[in-house]
Structure formats: structure tokens, C-alpha cells
């Protein structure tokens, strides 16, 4: 028994060493989402119509092609944001750290769109380390394009400084989504194949410049509705204090998104979807859980959600009678209770309980795909391991 005990101890110590290395923690702040703002103002239905979105019958269609098409609704519910600094001296921006895309972009001083007037803008002339690249880029968001030019400068995230990082400077931002959003830009953490314009992503440069001890990062999203205290993105490893039990390592099936295989989706005791397997992505840049619209419509009916002012909601008094929804992944069950997948809000002094599921039509060849967004990640600590091309999941500690 003694050799076995020694072996187990060594494996435990190795795992802890790998986990902790030198961790660089990026605090994530939780703010009110754009959907909640629009709902409180009674403008949500108008928003759907102005963007030609049908959120009840089907939803937004997304024809993904190497990451140049991003579904608009992905960012409607975003609540967790961090800070990135660009240039010398630093110019600070609030960004979404998004595992579902691979570019860094922020508004440019040359942008004339209403969204840019409502947010900080990057001034290249004020940075002594800025380098002009000059290439143009374009990312499709829903019904409009975000366009701009690519520049290069030093980019800092909580003490990690990447030299010569190419990033997008937006000169045109579409629609109203970015006008009212809490974030200024997006920092993508997906694979290089998703990067628009062949730009090397920030995390790839962190690895290449030996800024992280281990080629991985991890995400913990607090369930605390008042500011999300403790939420963080960790570069260079993971923090075992944020989860219970051990990590279940799931192979990445396609390197672009952080894409994994689903073995099934169970509602209550019944496997309703993916009984023969399907594909999903773990995405910090999507707040809800999305899936093929017809499947999501069936799921909404199964949990008792009904259309209400352009979105699905349930009677808040029925939560204790609603079924659990379980995702079967790599032999492990990941169960969300109704309190996890129903999102409460207060509208005109009345309690509103919205569904955490949303239809999203991701067309071939990238789709169909399910997206496990923040509703899922809040309950399951997520580790993104580039060294072994795998995702680690474990129950998050509240």
C-alpha cells in the first residue's frame, strides 16, 4: 500500500503545482445587462424589431465563417467585465473577455458612430509605443458590420504586458447594442483560426512571450447579483479554491471555438436532445445557454416558459415545480436547477423571471452548435487548457 500512497501523493502535488504555478488574476465586475436596461425602460420589443430579430419563433441566424460573423444577442446579456490597458502611457478600456472570438478591439478616436461617442476611444498619437499596421478589418454583428483598422501596441492585463500586440481600432460600430453597452470593446480568447485578419490573439502572444507559467487560463463567475464579488479570469493556471471535487477534462473537438462534445441533454429524467451526441462550445462571451431554435423552443415548453413581450419567461412562483436541466459531458452530469437557469429581475416593482435559454441558429459548416454561456459557467468553474487542447469543468464554489 505504501508505494500506492506515495504515487497518489505525488500526483496530488503535481496537480496542485500545475494548478497554481504563477497565477495572474483579472477581477471581473458585474454590471446590469443591456437586456435588463431595455426591459426596465420598456424598450426591449422595439429593440428586437429594429434589429429584425424574432426572439420567440426562431431567433437570430448566424452564418459563422472563421469568426467574422458574431451573433448580436451574444452580448445583450453580458454582465461580467474587466479592464485592459493599451499604449504608453496606458489608455484603459472595459472589455468582455470572450472565449468565443479571438480579436481584441476597442473604439478609435477616428470613429464617428454614436457608440464611440458614448465610450472611451483609443488615441494612437498619445502612445509612444504605437505602431501603425494599416490593415482593415470587419466583423459582422447581427444586421450591421463593425469595421476599422489594425494597429499594434503594448497591451497590459493586470501586470501582464504583451509587446507588439495587434488589435482592432473600430471606426464604425453598428446599431444601438454598443451604444448602451457597459463594455467598450472585446478581448477574444479563442483559437487563432477565429482571428479576423490573421492577427495573433492576445493569449497566444502571452504564451509566446513567456508571460504565463502554464498555457491555460480559467474563469470563475460569482453568482452574487450585487456586483459579482470574487469573479475573476486567471491566466497561467487555475485556482482549486474556486471549485469542489476534481476537474473533468474534456477534449476540444475542433480548434476555433472551445468546442466539445455533448453526450446528451436531459430535462428532468428524460434525455430530450443530443441523444446521439452533438457539439457545444464553452463561451464566456455568451451570457445565456443557446441552441438550435427549434430545440430551444421545445426546451422552453418543457420547463414551462411562455412568450412575454418578446422573450420567454416563467411564473416566479413555480420555480420549485420546474425540472432540472442536465448536460451530459464526457461521462459526467452537469445539472442546472431552475434557480440556476431562470434569471430574476425587478420590473416596475414586479418580479420577472426570464428563461436562461435562447435560440441561436448557427448554420453549417460551423453549426449546429449549443453554447454553454455564463448561465452554465456560473455553476461550473471552467479551465481552458491550450497546452493539451482541453476544457476542465468542476462544480463552482459559491
From Swiss-Prot:
CC terms in the record's Gene Ontology section: endosome
Catalytic center at which residues? 98, 283
Transmembrane stretches, by residue range? none
**What subcellular compartments does it reside in?**
Endosome
Q: Which residues form the propeptide?
A: 22-58
- Name the EC number(s): 3.4.23.34
Major localization class: other
Q: Where is the Peptidase A1 domain?
A: 80-394
Keywords, sorted A to Z: Aspartyl protease, Autocatalytic cleavage, Disulfide bond, Endosome, Glycoprotein, Hydrolase, Protease, Signal, Zymogen
Found, by tissue, as follows: Expressed abundantly in lymphocytes and macrophages of the thymus and spleen, and in the M cells of the intestine. In the brain, expression is limited to reactive microglial cells, the large pyrimidial neurons in the cerebral cortex, the CA1 and CA3 pyrimidial neurons of the hippocampus, the large neurons of the neostriatum, and the Purkinje neurons of the cerebellum.
Signal sequence span is 1-21
Keyword Cell cycle appears in the UniProt entry = no
Q: What else is known?
A: Administration of dexamethasone results in the conversion of the proenzyme to the mature form in thymocytes.
What does the record give as the function of this protein? May have a role in immune function. Probably involved in the processing of antigenic peptides during MHC class II-mediated antigen presentation. May play a role in activation-induced lymphocyte depletion in the thymus, and in neuronal degeneration and glial cell activation in the brain.
Family from the record: Belongs to the peptidase A1 family.
Name of the protein: Cathepsin E
Amino acid at each position: 500500500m505504501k508505494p500506492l500512497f506515495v504515487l497518489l501523493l505525488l500526483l496530488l502535488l503535481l496537480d496542485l503545482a500545475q494548478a497554481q504555478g504563477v497565477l495572474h488574476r483579472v477581477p471581473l465586475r458585474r454590471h446590469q445587462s443591456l437586456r435588463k436596461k431595455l426591459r426596465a425602460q420598456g424598450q426591449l420589443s422595439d429593440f428586437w424589431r429594429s434589429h429584425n430579430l424574432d426572439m420567440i419563433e426562431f431567433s437570430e441566424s448566424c452564418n459563422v465563417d472563421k469568426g467574422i460573423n458574431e451573433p448580436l444577442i451574444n452580448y445583450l446579456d453580458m454582465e461580467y467585465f474587466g479592464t485592459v490597458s493599451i499604449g504608453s502611457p496606458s489608455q484603459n478600456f472595459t472589455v468582455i473577455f470572450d472565449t468565443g472570438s479571438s480579436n481584441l478591439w476597442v473604439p478609435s478616436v477616428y470613429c464617428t458612430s454614436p457608440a464611440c461617442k458614448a465610450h472611451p476611444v483609443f488615441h494612437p498619437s498619445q502612445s509612444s509605443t504605437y505602431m501603425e499596421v494599416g490593415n482593415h478589418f470587419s466583423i459582422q454583428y447581427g444586421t450591421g458590420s463593425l469595421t476599422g483598422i489594425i494597429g499594434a501596441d503594448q497591451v497590459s492585463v493586470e501586470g501582464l504586458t504583451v509587446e507588439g500586440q495587434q488589435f482592432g481600432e473600430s471606426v464604425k460600430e453598428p446599431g444601438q447594442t454598443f451604444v448602451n453597452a457597459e463594455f467598450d470593446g472585446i478581448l477574444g480568447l479563442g483559437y487563432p483560426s477565429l482571428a479576423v485578419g490573421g492577427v495573433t490573439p492576445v493569449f497566444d502572444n502571452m504564451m509566446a512571450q513567456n508571460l504565463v507559467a502554464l498555457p491555460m487560463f480559467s474563469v470563475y463567475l460569482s453568482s452574487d447579483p450585487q456586483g459579482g464579488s470574487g469573479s475573476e479570469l486567471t491566466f497561467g493556471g487555475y485556482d482549486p479554491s474556486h471549485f469542489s471535487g476534481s476537474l473533468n477534462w474534456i477534449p476540444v473537438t475542433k480548434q476555433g471555438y472551445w468546442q466539445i462534445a455533448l453526450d446528451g441533454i436531459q430535462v428532468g429524467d428524460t434525455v430530450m436532445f443530443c441523444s446521439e451526441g452533438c457539439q457545444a462550445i464553452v463561451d464566456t462571451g455568451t451570457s445565456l445557454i443557446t441552441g438550435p431554435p427549434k430545440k430551444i423552443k421545445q426546451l422552453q415548453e418543457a420547463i414551462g416558459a411562455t412568450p412575454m413581450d418578446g422573450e420567454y419567461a416563467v411564473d416566479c412562483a413555480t420555480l420549485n415545480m420546474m425540472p432540472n436541466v442536465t448536460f451530459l459531458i464526457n461521462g459526467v452530469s452537469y445539472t442546472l436547477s431552475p434557480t440556476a437557469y431562470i434569471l430574476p429581475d425587478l420590473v416596475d416593482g414586479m418580479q420577472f423571471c426570464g428563461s436562461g435559454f435562447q435560440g441561436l441558429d448557427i448554420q453549417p459548416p460551423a453549426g449546429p452548435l449549443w453554447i454553454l454561456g455564463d448561465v452554465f459557467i456560473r455553476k461550473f468553474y471552467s479551465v481552458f487548457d491550450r497546452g493539451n487542447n482541453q476544457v476542465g469543468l468542476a462544480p463552482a464554489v459559491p
